[in-house]
């Protein structure tokens, strides 16, 4: 590993966290280039609420403010905390709803809690066909990226890019890593520390009470995708690195 780092003219990594990791091993910063794994910016787009068929299919109220989680409903996603927040918001902010899209090992327990606590502000939806992915990520006014503490320190979940591609702000309750820097640096969401229930609840309320900010963050998220995550941007960065290395020989 060290031999490779020492003799390479340039090293391409897929995230700022990977860059920090190899810099800690003594690799000079000017030797490292970050090129994100690209996404298909046309696979997930914003579907206006009045044209989103899933609102009709699952009897969702188009006048409400929704936060949405789409993905694995498992043991590490901190669903208990999320449902506690929704229990509190049901009393204080009845116009805020949660849409849960997905399957997983903890889904039955989630359904039991929703029924036990009469969480009428929570709607559970099964995974949808891939061709409806834009409809799915356009259900919420904001998209959720959540985990229990200690689970996500070294990763940015891929659903982050889908949320941003749909022009939705990201509400992250996650371990501190590159995701925090992306959301803050590009003003495309709100980051709270994994497990901090009150901070997370306040982030939901903040976007609910400021729809202009919510839309701004969503627009900025889409811009980040277009500026950094398209195939065209990614491949051009590879070409630029190759040209630089070859030109120096």
Question: Where do the model's predicted regions map?
Answer:
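Membrane-proximal helix-turn-helix segments that form the acceptor-binding/catalytic region
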Residues: 1-11
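A short helix/loop element that forms part of the nucleotide-sugar donor recognition site in Leloir-type
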Residues: 45-60
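Nucleotide-sugar-dependent
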Residues: 77, 129-135, 143-164, 170-181
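Nucleotide-activated donor-binding/catalytic signature segment of Leloir-type glycosyltransferases, i.e.
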Residues: 99-102, 107-134
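A short, well-ordered alpha-helix in the C-terminal region of glycosyltransferases
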Residues: 199-206, 213-227, 240
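Conserved acidic donor-binding segment of nucleotide-sugar-dependent glycosyltransferases
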Residues: 185-186, 190-197, 206-212
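Carbohydrate-associated surface elements
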Residues: 17, 38
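Conserved donor-binding/catalytic core segment of Leloir-type glycosyltransferases
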Residues: 61-77, 83-86, 99
């Amino acid at each position: 590993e060290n031999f490779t780092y020492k003799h390479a003219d340039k090293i391409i990594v897929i995230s700022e966290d990977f860059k920090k990791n190899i810099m800690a091993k003594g690799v000079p910063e000017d030797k490292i280039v970050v090129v994100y794994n690209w996404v298909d910016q046309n696979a997930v787009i914003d579907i206006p609420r009045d044209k989103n068929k899933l609102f009709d299919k699952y009897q969702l109220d188009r006048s409400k403010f929704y936060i949405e989680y789409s993905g694995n409903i498992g043991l590490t996603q901190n669903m208990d905390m999320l449902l506690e927040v929704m229990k509190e918001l049901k009393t204080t902010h009845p116009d805020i709803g949660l849409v849960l899209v997905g399957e997983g090992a903890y889904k039955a327990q989630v359904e039991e809690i929703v029924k036990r606590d009469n969480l009428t502000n929570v709607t559970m939806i099964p995974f949808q066909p891939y061709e409806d992915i834009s409809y799915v990520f356009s259900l919420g006014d904001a998209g959720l990226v959540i985990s229990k503490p200690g689970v996500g320190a070294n990763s940015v979940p891929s659903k982050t890019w889908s949320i941003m591609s749909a022009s939705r702000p990201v509400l992250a309750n996650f371990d501190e890593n590159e995701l925090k820097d992306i959301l803050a640096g590009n003003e495309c969401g709100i980051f709270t520390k994994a497990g901090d229930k009150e901070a997370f609840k306040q982030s939901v309320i903040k976007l609910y009470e400021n729809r202009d900010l919510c839309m701004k963050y969503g627009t900025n998220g889409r811009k980040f995708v277009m500026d950094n995550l398209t195939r065209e941007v990614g491949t051009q960065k590879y070409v630029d690195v190759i040209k630089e290395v070859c030109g120096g020989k």
